[in-house]
């Protein structure tokens, strides 16, 4: 499959995910910055800029995870750490401002954590199975989807720092 076709499919999926986020999140484009000892500061970006940030976060994450998948289990381990952090964040923080049920998101994360652990068991040196483009793009799409639905696209820079640096 050519790179242009892959990017076209990524664009279609990104537009679908961002449209769903716009539909389900009542405050699409409103970002919160937590300032220690001061509280929470809200700022609203224009819709086009918020859409662009979400689009680049999605396509960037998908391609970064795809490029990271070069060695035995490298992308799987990185996504395992990111999903574990998101799960810890969901349990530790209160996301009362979200307009959808977070328990569904937790179930999805637990399912993917289990599948990544099973994959890593068979992907140790010498690897018996490989993730390939389909698996790495799916994991990148999952991470981007979760961050977009939680309105944490800007935090993706810090949490996915290793993946972004390798890309």
Language-model segments: residues:
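"…together with the soluble PPM/PP2C metallo-phosphatase catalytic core" -> "…together
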Residues: 1-165
